[in-house]
Structure formats: structure tokens, C-alpha cells
Curated annotation (Swiss-Prot):
Topology feature Extracellular, residues: 33-64, 112-118, 175-183, 291-304, 353-363, 421-429
Positions of region (Important for selectivity against fructose): 277-279
Lineage, highest ranks first: Eukaryota, Metazoa, Chordata, Craniata, Vertebrata
Binding-site list for D-glucose: Q159, Q280, Q281, N286, N315, E378, W386
Subcellular location: Cell membrane; Perikaryon; Cell projection
Sequence ranges of Polar residues compositional bias: 484-494
Protein name: Solute carrier family 2, facilitated glucose transporter member 3
Record's keyword terms, sorted: Cell membrane, Cell projection, Glycoprotein, Membrane, Phosphoprotein, Sugar transport, Transmembrane, Transmembrane helix, Transport
Entry-linked CDD domains: MFS_GLUT_Class1
Similarity annotation: Belongs to the major facilitator superfamily. Sugar transporter (TC 2.A.1.1) family. Glucose transporter subfamily.
SUPFAM superfamilies in the record: MFS general substrate transporter
Residues with the Phosphothreonine modification: T232, T492
Keyword Nucleus appears in the UniProt entry: no
Organism from which the protein derives: Bos taurus (Bovine)
A Pfam family it matches: Sugar_tr
Length: 494
């Protein structure tokens, strides 16, 4: 249980799984660069079909639909996670849904040749469905195959895959690469290649040992996989912990989404999970990238698109930093630091945006605030909400919890994308004050309600929530408060 050995089979399995995270990031960012070119495609295609030419309102609506339909697919996919992982397992589920990525990529890649707006929109919907499923599968699989002492560091690799995907999409979208009138279908269809690579590699990755033992009762196979992944023969304590959880599961009824909100021992962790997902999407990170190009242009940057890519590089670098910090500082501490730093930068951005017309040097202050804001995001609110959900729940409720948390993330992402342009139009630079208020609310919630899970087994975390529920009915202070410490469980194998 206390192993910190990093083995080749473990790294291989996690790397293959994070291809799904890369796909999510890539398909999130890929639509932005060729916006003008795709609008021209929509206009040309509709003109060929009918007279009179399409109105600007229709074109804007179709473009908005092409962008937003991705999030709609993500909502549906994220809420369907449990349907796959409980029936097929974690690894097989990732393998099966790559068919969606290939189908969606083909539709988008061939939409120009077919002169079909419908193929583009349907392809975005299907790829959104795929990415929504991946946002549940990947953190769950990584969390279940990782040693307790390294679970947070490996869990952060999910976010690293996402930001690398966004960065690659930004780079490929440059006019000198694939962001041209002729090559943009290849830019969208590129998602087929990672899907094929993952399909080829997944058969060589083991199934989650927790799924095999707890769900399938295949103890020997689970033990063999743990020994191979962790590079140690001494996995008896971990196997016993899984067997104890399996026994508890057999005495409980199957956990549904409604049960998560009804049962006292699940209610607090699911509320924490939802709030952490909201803290990611309502932090203002999308607003920062929305404003960044204009700010870089005002500061005299000749090619603001390259500066935006630079912000993406900062995004990636600080996600790597988070990988090394999360097991040292703890999830809760990093999330608090991230939220606090972002709140300060939001205020600084508001002030500098309001004054940059009067003081030209304020544009450089604003650029600095943007880069630091992005860095703080990747230290806490970026990576932590994805993998901490898997830590807060046992094997039984975990799929349903991942579905609810993922759906709340996708839904809030969709709403921010829908409402932010109007908010920015009416509020201008003051829009960041709204995000500052959200960040302060989430900081307070995290400080008082979010436990530290570093170094604790799934069973220990679950028992702590159950203990709080039981003692809470007697008006006593529950043991979950002890988890707000950043001290990990002592290594009993030492």
C-alpha cells in the first residue's frame, strides 16, 4: 500500500489512458482557429443549396450550434459513464468508445468533400459524446490502477493530457500548418489518429484490479495485475482492502444517481464533487482565453495568436509542476492556493483592463496577470476536480458519482459558453469581478468542506464520510475533519 515504485507497465497503461484526455483537449480547442474558414464553408454550402443566400443570423446560429453541440454531446456522454464501466469494465469501455471518435472524425473530415453542414454538426455531436465518456473513464481508470502514494500525481496526468491536446490543436490550427481553406477538414479529422493508436495499445493494458476483484470476484487475476503494475509481491494489504470493500458492496443495494443525493453518507461527497467541478468552469479560465488575443494585440504583439499559444505553453508547464506538487502539498492545499491566486489575478485584470487605454503599460500588467492566472489554474482548479471525485467514493457509487460530476462540469461549461459573450458585452472588464466572487465562494467552500485525501485509501476516505454521518446525528464532530490535515497515512509496510 505504501509503494512509490514507478514501473514500465504502470506508465504504459496510464499513458495509453490519457490519450482519451488528449482527445478531449484537442477537440475542445480545435474549432477556434479555423472559425472564419468554417463560416465561409457554411455560407458557400448553403448558397449552393438554395436561394436567396443565407442570412448572417442563420450563419451565426449554425456556427454557434457547431461549437455548442460538442458540449451537448459531452453532457450526454458524461452521464452515461456508468452504463459502460459497470458492464464492460474500465479498459474495455475506453476501447469500445473509440468507435465514436473514429465515426465523428470521419464525419468532420469528409464534410467539405460532401458539402454537408449536417455532417460537420453531427460529427461534433458524436465527438462530444466520446469526450464526455472519456472524462469519466480516464480519471477512474488511472485512480484505480495507481498506488495510493502516487494516486494524485498520476491523476494530474489526466489534466496534462487535456492541456497538451488544447496546445496541439492551437499549433495545428496555425495557417502555416492545417488552418487553411483546403486543410481544415484534416485539422478536425485528425482526432481519428489518436483513436486508432489507443485502440492498438489498449489490449496490452490491464483491466482495473479493483474492478476485477470487487465487481468480477477475480481475486487471483487482480493480485497478479497489482504485482505487475506496482512492481512488488507484497500487495496483500491492498487485496484485503478491496475484499473488505467487496463485502460491504454485497450488503448494499446498487447505488443510483438519486441514491447519491438521498443517502447521508453519499450526500456530502457528491456535493463536494459538484462544487469542485463548478469551481473549475466558473473560475473564469475560458474568459481569460477569450480576452487574451485582444489584450496581446493592444500590448503591441504583432501576432497575438502566437502569444495565445504561449499562454497554452504556460498552461502545460504548470500542469507538469502540479504533478510533482500534488503528493507533497495535498489536493486541498493546492486547490486553495489556486483559487486564491486566481481571485487576486482577476482583480488585477479588472483594474488593468479598465486603465489600459489611459496607461499603455497597463497592457503588460494585464498580460502578466493572465499568465499567472493560468498558472494558478493549473496548480489547483484545473487538474484536481477531475481525479478527486474518484477518490471520494468507493467502488459501488464511483461510476454514478463520476457521471454526475462530469455532467455538472460539461453543463456549466456549456452555460458559460452560452452566457459569457452577453455578460462580456454588458459588463466589459467588470465581468472578471463576477468570476472573482465565484472564486471567493469556492475558496470558502473548499476551506470548510473539502477533505484532504492525500495518502489515504479509498476505504479510509469512505469510512471517514460514514463516520461523520453517524456522529453528526448525535451532534458530535465527525472524523472527516481530521482529513483536512495534509498528513498522509503512515506507511505500514515500512
Amino acid at each position: 500500500m505504501g509503494t512509490t515504485k514507478v514501473t514500465a507497465p504502470l506508465i504504459f497503461a496510464i499513458s495509453v489512458a490519457t490519450i482519451g484526455s488528449f482527445q478531449f483537449g484537442y477537440n475542445t480547442g480545435v474549432i477556434n482557429a479555423p472559425e472564419a474558414i468554417i463560416k465561409d464553408f457554411l455560407n458557400y454550402t448553403l448558397e449552393e443549396r438554395s436561394e436567396p443566400p443565407p442570412s448572417s443570423v442563420l450563419l451565426t446560429s449554425l456556427w454557434s450550434l457547431s461549437v455548442a453541440i460538442f458540449s451537448v454531446g459531452g453532457m450526454i456522454g458524461s452521464f452515461s459513464v456508468g452504463l459502460f464501466v459497470n458492464r464492460f469494465g474500465r479498459g474495455n469501455s475506453m476501447l469500445i468508445v473509440n468507435l465514436l471518435a473514429i465515426a465523428g472524425g470521419c464525419l468532420m473530415g469528409f464534410c467539405k468533400i460532401a458539402e454537408s453542414v449536417e455532417m460537420l454538426i453531427l460529427g461534433r455531436l458524436i465527438i462530444g459524446l466520446f469526450c464526455g465518456l472519456c472524462t469519466g473513464f480516464v480519471p477512474m481508470y488511472i485512480g484505480e490502477i495507481s498506488p495510493t502514494a502516487l494516486r494524485g500525481a498520476f491523476g494530474t496526468l489526466n489534466q496534462l493530457g487535456i492541456v497538451i491536446g488544447i496546445l496541439v490543436a492551437q499549433i495545428f490550427g496555425l495557417k502555416v500548418i492545417l488552418g487553411t481553406e483546403d486543410l481544415w477538414p484534416l485539422l478536425l479529422g485528425f482526432t481519428i489518429l489518436p483513436a486508432i493508436i489507443q485502440c492498438a495499445a489498449l489490449p496490452f493494458c490491464p483491466e482495473s484490479p479493483r474492478f476485477l476483484l470487487i465487481n468480477r470476484k477475480e481475486e487471483e487475476k487482480a493480485k497478479e495485475i497489482l504485482q505487475r503494475l506496482w512492481g512488488t509481491e507484497d500487495v496483500a494489504q491492498d487485496i484485503q482492502e478491496m475484499k473488505d470493500e467487496s463485502m460491504r458492496m454485497s450488503q448494499e443495494k446498487q447505488v443510483t444517481v438519486l441514491e447519491l443525493f438521498r443517502a447521508p453518507n453519499y450526500r456530502q461527497p457528491i456535493i463536494i464533487s459538484i462544487m469542485l467541478q463548478l469551481s473549475q468552469q466558473l473560475s473564469g479560465i475560458n474568459a481569460v482565453f477569450y480576452y487574451s488575443t485582444g489584450i496581446f494585440k493592444d500590448a503591441g504583439v504583432q501576432e497575438p495568436v502566437y502569444a495565445t499559444i504561449g499562454a497554452g505553453v504556460v498552461n502545460t508547464i504548470f500542469t507538469v509542476v502540479s504533478v510533482f506538487l500534488v503528493e507533497r502539498a495535498g489536493r486541498r492545499t493546492l486547490h486553495l492556493i489556486g483559487l486564491g491566486g486566481m481571485a487576486f489575478c482577476s482583480i488585477l485584470m479588472t483594474i488593468s483592463l479598465l486603465l489600459k487605454d489611459n496607461y499603455s503599460w497597463m497592457s503588460f500588467i494585464c498580460i502578466g496577470a493572465i499568465l499567472v492566472f493560468v498558472a494558478f489554474f493549473e496548480i489547483g482548479p484545473g487538474p484536481i476536480p477531475w481525479f478527486i471525485v474518484a477518490e471520494l467514493f468507493g467502488q459501488g457509487p464511483r461510476p454514478a458519482a463520476m457521471a454526475v460530476a462530469g455532467c455538472s462540469n460539461w453543463t456549466s461549461n456549456f452555460l458559460v459558453g452560452l452566457l459569457f459573450p452577453s455578460a462580456a458585452f454588458y459588463l466589459g472588464a467588470y465581468v472578471f469581478i463576477v468570476f472573482t466572487v465565484f472564486l471567493v465562494i469556492f475558496w470558502v467552500f473548499t476551506f470548510f468542506k473539502v477533505p484532504e485525501t492525500r495518502g489515504r485509501t479509498f476505504e479510509e476516505i469512505t469510512r471517514a464520510f460514514e463516520g461523520q454521518t453517524q456522529t453528526g446525528t448525535r451532534g458530535e464532530k465527525g472524523p472527516i475533519m481530521e482529513m483536512n490535515s495534509i498528513q498522509p497515512t503512515k506507511d505500514t509496510n515500512a
